[in-house]
């Protein structure tokens, strides 16, 4: 759930939020056992790292100019998290140990040719995400204690938590074990590729275009 939203980022991750503001970016409509989206790098930031995101590493192969100004996040349910940066891939694996404990393993992947460069230095990215991981783990531990309390009433999802709801629906569907899959919010009727051609420079127009595609998808069933 923590990975699936950035509503907590301004307060918990001020360093991250300065590079990719929590209220910018888009979800990627999806079906199946995954959910994802992207956030734009702002200002002169080139990646997620210390020193305001500056670095001298080349892009990963296949990156476009558009890709190089985005951080893309994908959750492959139930426990694989992929964070694609212009210059490296970060992977989290979450291993449940008990109802109240998990082991989180974080790995970074860089192109072998990049690691051979004379000026290769990954300490900025490693240091940034070590800091961010620890910030997340701390608040997750606090939340775990809070939700275990009988005094805590269930809360509502905000408009910035559609991906959290999608994850929770997946878990609920598995517990129900009736073979049915609950539709996911505004993106329930769209599949990957359905947003091709939408201009995200005008957010209002983009939302209207997505709504039109969603309505057309629902009407065609």
Indicate residue ranges for each PLM-predicted region.
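C-terminal catalytic domain of Rieske-type non-heme iron oxygenases
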Residues: 1-221
